[in-house]
């Protein structure tokens, strides 16, 4: 959900299932399913010091138990709540018990550019939303959204790779596609270092910056269809060389081999069967 672009009537769920809810995907053959709701917003300016508060007002929650985790950029807080009425799940709020989750934080935890709030139900059952508020200083100003893409984050990678026989340190461009097939361009100190057509959903691109032998500051610019959407200073530094094994991430499905891989003890090679690593 992107503030200023998405519609709460069509793009935000009124209810979020927990892992105890089979209608949310949990089952003995499909495993334990948790769900996340992401709220993206762009900040054009903010004070260095100040306090904010995120308020999540719930109509009700599962009468047994729900553990809700709220993440704001890199900080998080967990809430364990217990609701009252099962009927709230189907829209009958006569016996509902309101739950208000408050998350105070500093403006230092926000950043100019892309920010994200993630709401997750880690344990227990469903929650039903009423409203979500972010209170803070009037000097925190929302920025305008680009029509085609939302830039989540720009950061130097903590590794180097090889490109055409030369070492490079990637500049990680975390971008969310919104509309059309826009051209993404990245400049470093005024020179184009990366270009790609955006397609669907979220992508993290590696824009290759020439490797350095000592720390060095450079200016980066990110453009979409030749429109500047972010610029800033990046600190380049020497890093270790990344291997293919370092890209393994169990959170996105990379894990151990399944039992059906063959040939193997359960199906010797003499039986002439080759199976994919499923």
Tell me what each language-model feature is:
Residues 1, 5-7, 15-49, 57-142, ...:
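Beta-strand-rich ligand-recognition modules
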Residues 31-41, 45-55, 155-174:
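Contiguous beta-strand segments within globular domains
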Residues 61-64, 176-182:
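Short proline/glycine-enriched turn/loop motifs at strand-loop junctions of beta-rich domains
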Residues 115-120, 184, 216-226:
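Short, aromatic- and glycine-rich surface loops/edge beta-strands on solvent-exposed regions
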Residues 125-126, 225-230:
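Short, exposed coil/turn segments at beta-strand boundaries within extracellular/luminal domains
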Residues 132-164:
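Short, compositionally biased P/S/T/A/G/V-rich stretches that sit at domain boundaries
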Residues 166-170, 177-181, 204-222, 232-278:
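Accessory carbohydrate-recognition regions in carbohydrate-active enzymes
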């Amino acid at each position: 959900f992107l503030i200023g672009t998405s519609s709460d009537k069509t793009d935000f769920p009124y209810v979020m299932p927990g892992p105890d809810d089979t209608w949310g995907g949990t089952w003995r053959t499909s495993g334990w399913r948790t769900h996340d709701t992401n709220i993206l917003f762009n900040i054009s300016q903010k004070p260095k010091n100040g306090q904010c508060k995120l308020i999540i007002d719930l109509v009700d929650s599962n009468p047994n138990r729900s553990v809700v985790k709220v993440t704001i950029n890199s900080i998080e807080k967990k809430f364990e709540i217990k609701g009252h009425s099962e009927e709230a799940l189907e829209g009958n709020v006569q016996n509902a018990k309101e739950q208000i989750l408050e998350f105070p934080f500093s403006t230092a935890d926000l950043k100019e550019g892309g920010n994200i709030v993630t709401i997750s139900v880690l344990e227990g059952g469903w929650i039903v939303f009423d409203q979500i508020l972010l209170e803070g200083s009037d000097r925190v100003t929302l920025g305008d959204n680009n029509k085609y893409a939302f830039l989540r984050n720009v950061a130097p990678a903590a590794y180097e790779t090889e490109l055409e026989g030369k070492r490079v340190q990637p500049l990680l461009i975390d971008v969310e596609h919104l509309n059309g097939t826009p051209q993404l361009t990245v400049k470093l100190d005024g020179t184009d270092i990366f270009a790609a057509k955006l397609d669907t959903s979220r992508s993290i691109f590696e824009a290759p910056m020439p490797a350095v032998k000592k720390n060095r500051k450079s200016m980066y610019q990110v453009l979409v269809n030749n429109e500047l959407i972010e610029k800033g200073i990046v600190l380049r530094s020497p890093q270790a060389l990344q291997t293919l094994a370092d890209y393994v991430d169990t959170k996105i499905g990379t894990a151990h081999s399944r039992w059906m891989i063959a040939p193997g003890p359960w199906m010797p090679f003499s039986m002439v069967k080759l199976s994919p690593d499923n």
